[in-house]
Amino acid sequence: MIKGVKICGISDITTLTHILDHDFPPKFIGFICDYKKSKRYVSYERLKTLLNVDRKNTNFVSVLVNPKNEVLERMKKLNFDFLQLYNVEPKKTKMIKEKYGIKIITALTIIDQNDVNEYKNYMGISDIFLFDGKGYEKSIGFDHKLLNSVPKSLNKMIAGNIKLDDIPKFNDKDIYVDLSGALENEDGKKDVNKIDRLLNLVNK
């Protein structure tokens, strides 16, 4: 059974409230905080309003791509539960974790086995390892068989072009599953019906 799900790319209060009020809210909700190329990007000013809600038992995740110090200082003020870091070296990741006293999701973008093996450099630093496809906002998948070499005990999450119909195949794996694009309509907006389907499916 999967550990739970992360719904990523939330950018409006209506969708956020709907998710948090669901009978089976997700373990994580992700917000794109500094990658302005993404259609899901949320500015700092909007985040201050958006995050002023009762999180209940859901972890709020700030998704960052090699963030500058001023960005990290802003994120600190928003009291996120996790920072999800792309393109951040182990040494800097450790510094961020120690300085800000926050849990870390290290995001590794995967094409081949060498990319997967990068997780070893973050052992003892990262709290969760996210294995994602290349492309950031483009949601590109990768061969999940590449993860067969990863210890089952590793706290891991999988993302990258995962569809709702893919969820059942993960049901025997001790992982978190991260979805974004699969929960959107043709206009690129989150579809609450698809979100409901996901949360009900995971909690059958």
Task: Identify what each model region corresponds to.
Residues 1-204:
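Conserved N-terminal beta1-alpha1 strand-loop-helix module at the mouth
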